[in-house]
Amino acid sequence: MRTTYVLHIIRSGRGTLEIHNQKYELTAGDAFLLCPDVEAWYEADWEDPWSYMWVGFTGYRAQEYAGHAGFTKRTPIRKVNCGKELNSYIDGILEAHQLSYTDELKRNGYLMLFFATLMEDYKKIVPAIVNQHSYPGSVYVKHAMDYIAHHYREKIKISELADYIGVNR
């Protein structure tokens, strides 16, 4: 049984995923998440085998990031429209393969870009989440105070402050 999350993005071909006693027929543009401690079975189609990319991840915010990107234990699959960008981030992770602090930071940076891109893609698919703020109010207040502290000599517009902290319509 796996102990990490593994996210697969199908680049071409077809295959089958079985998870939670449910069977999914997947094709290019589909993505699926395998969660820790969840049994899953998957295989490529015999006539049109898939090619996919994948990234494994773990951490105290892993489930949260996956959820904001549209993946949960109950909904482990979805379409993605940003495969080329995601592929470039996975390439970056693979290129930063040395066991060094700089490459570790590069791998983490590419993984964050990977999730940011997935989240932006998900917002396009499910527009209702665009206005959903996921941080506690105190975080927004702190960012507002930081902005004011750094710009106190300037004429501050409320709309600029709202843009900075991410709450502007």
Over which residues does each language-model region extend?
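Amphipathic, well-ordered alpha-helical segments in soluble domains
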Residues: V6-I9, R61, E85-Y89, Y110, ...
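Short, Lys/Arg-enriched, Trp-marked, Pro/Gly-tolerant hinge/linker segments that flank
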Residues: K73-K84, A96-R107, A116-I165
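N-terminal regulatory/effector-sensing and dimerization cores
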Residues: M1-R74, L99, D103
